[in-house]
Design a protein with these regions (language model features):
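A short, basic/flexible loop-to-alpha-helix module at the beginning of a structural domain
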Residues: 1-8, 98-103
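N-terminal phosphate-binding or glycine-rich loops at protein starts, especially the Walker A/P-loop
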Residues: 4-57
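Short glycine-rich or small-residue beta-strand-to-loop segments that form or flank ligand, phosphate
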Residues: 10-20, 76-78, 111-115
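General beta-strand structural signal in soluble alpha/beta enzymes
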Residues: 13, 43-46, 78-79, 115-117, ...
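Acidic, glycine-rich active-site loops and adjacent beta-strand->loop/helix elements
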Residues: 17, 47-53, 81-83, 118-120, ...
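Short Gly/Thr/Asp-enriched flexible loops that form oxyanion-binding sites at enzyme active sites
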Residues: 26-30, 119-133
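Short, acidic/small-residue loops that bind anionic groups at enzyme active sites
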Residues: 37, 43-44, 128-142
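Glycine-rich oxoanion-binding loops at beta->alpha junctions
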Residues: 55-113, 120
Length: 142
């Protein structure tokens, strides 16, 4: 909702794939825009990319988390590689990765998930979109 409304918005954010410059700057830009647009926004940061979304490893970000990171390389959330071709393959515990990510998304009542990642990350983002999740995907490469 626009400024002045009382509804809480929850937006998820993750960085995936290889680490590179500008991830922090991009996250900061997205967060800054969200904080300007909405009075009551909560940004949920997933640790280590899709892995954090799969295993519900997250933290509620504060505005101060995005301060001082503009010129810092890498990502304050961490990143990991989760091969797209294995997203539908259960892990060693039998966990269906896509179902686990959907479960976390809905459990946390996210309105949208912002994904910063390369080619494989974009394929996974599209897979989640096909599953009905609201995705904003920002491509990057090393």
């Amino acid at each position: 909702m626009k400024k002045g409304t009382a509804l809480m918005r929850r937006i998820g954010m993750l960085t995936s794939g290889g680490d590179c410059q500008s991830l922090n700057a991009t996250m900061r830009g997205v967060a800054k825009s969200l904080y300007k647009m909405f009075d009551d926004i909560e940004i949920v940061g997933f640790e280590d990319g899709y892995k954090g979304l799969m295993y519900a490893d997250y933290r509620i970000m504060k505005q101060s988390d995005f301060s001082g990171i503009l010129t810092r390389g890498g990502t304050i959330l961490g990143t990991s590689r989760q091969p797209f071709k294995l997203m539908r393959t259960p892990d060693e515990n039998g966990l269906d990765k896509v179902e686990a990510m959907k479960h976390t998304y809905y459990k946390l009542k996210l309105e949208c998930l912002v994904i910063l990642g390369g080619n494989g990350s974009q394929k996974t983002a599209n897979l989640l979109r096909e599953e009905g999740l609201n995705i904003v995907s920002l491509p990057k490469t090393i």
